[in-house]
């Protein structure tokens, strides 16, 4: 029993250490275990789209090195601002590029509005959605587009949608009219590329649609490493994600061509994705284009356009929160950007159940409490077996200590005597281990559900907890966590080794300090789980004591 408890504590402690190490690396600090050189970012050395030599396919255009605001007056671009009920953003006339996009979650009066900037182009951060033409000297994201006159830039009144269109200069006998369609309440932007052949010879361009960003995380929670990087989905190969480290090492693995699916950039809570027309053949590319910039995109060939003819290429651009039900309705497989890792098969049903509970109680905090209670009820038989084993071990602990003292000079005889004691009392020292091990994947899955669900962002619980995705502002839950862990150690058998006993007493303090920085929703889950475990253990131990008294 002592060995089992020690092993479980060691596993728990090592997991916590690894989470802390991931947090270190997420925040640009050296790993405690795998130190490595960090590439230096040099502001102004390369603009978005400029590639490291040898990394860019010959047919993809490079970006003009002049950053916005530094270009010559003749080629100075403008920023066209727009607003909807869910977006606030800017479109750069250089390329008609969506260069800034802030997501706005309206408050309910009690809670303030929540705003996060997803797309942006500054000296410290780059994240863009851009398009253009390939296959000749055609308009691309480097050219200055002209916004069409008399266009609305805001969603007002009862309007359901509005459009903003941009016209390119004529290049290679081709003119492009790019139109963005914004819809009320929607995180999907329609992007229409109208290609007009105004020349005298046929042309056969390709349209590229790409997402470009640096490797800087946004709103990453402490003590956790959530995925950030590009992803590709096709019906044939399903969901394929790549870390920026994979791309650095040229180890990215993904489908390079398809006629379905989408490409995306994924980060904690939020994602963006280009969703081309299904059935249209396209090539897919993922690459590093600068010491700290990466891109994922598609190239879609266009049928030959005769002089005077026009071809439309339509696509959808998703940019928003990773809300599973919404994502399922946008495109097949898009809900997979909410990444649970290896516990997906358990985590998805748990989140579904959490959603169902929330649909009745209307509060994510109470939903966590009720889901934890439900899980503990399901696992009660297994927990009971574990606690009964612990109770039996606690009952014979004085006799075990006496045997250890008696045979402390002869380990072989001591082990033989202990085995005989276990046999006589019908106690298995590892009897409580299997029930605990079976439950571990479920509790790990619930951890990732709470960590990955954007629904927790800005969600209040009670009184002082106004955001379950942020740490407890007054550290009340971490203190309750420490108290509950301390009570659990008191209910368990006292280790015979004084050093081990002191370590067990120190553990609640160590973990409570770490949990001070965990999201409140996670700490709430652990507190409720511990309280229920204490109640179960106390009840079972008391019942066994009463049964023993009656038998006597």
Swiss-Prot record:
GO molecular function: membrane insertase activity
Entry's Gene Ontology BP terms: protein insertion into membrane; protein transport
Membrane topology per record: Multi-pass membrane protein
Subcellular location, principal: membrane
Keyword annotations from UniProtKB, A to Z: Cell inner membrane, Cell membrane, Chaperone, Membrane, Protein transport, Transmembrane, Transmembrane helix, Transport
One Gene Ontology CC term in the entry: plasma membrane
Biased segments, Low complexity type: 42-59
Keyword Protein transport belongs to the record: yes
Transmembrane segments: 3-23, 364-384, 430-450, 504-524
Pfam family, one: YidC_periplas
Cell compartments where the protein resides: Cell inner membrane
Record's keyword annotation contains rRNA-binding: no
Record-linked InterPro entries: Membr_insert_YidC (IPR019998), Membr_insert_YidC_N (IPR028053), YidC/ALB3/OXA1/COX18 (IPR001708), YidC/Oxa/ALB_C (IPR028055), YidC_ALB_C (IPR047196), YidC_periplasmic_sf (IPR038221)
Region (Disordered) location: 36-59
Functional summary from the UniProt entry: Required for the insertion and/or proper folding and/or complex formation of integral membrane proteins into the membrane. Involved in integration of membrane proteins that insert both dependently and independently of the Sec translocase complex, as well as at least some lipoproteins. Aids folding of multispanning membrane proteins.
NCBIfam families to which the protein is assigned, alphabetical: PRK01318.1-3, yidC_nterm, yidC_oxa1_cterm
Subunit structure as annotated in this protein's UniProt entry: Interacts with the Sec translocase complex via SecD. Specifically interacts with transmembrane segments of nascent integral membrane proteins during membrane integration.
Family: Belongs to the OXA1/ALB3/YidC family. Type 1 subfamily.
Protein name: Membrane protein insertase YidC
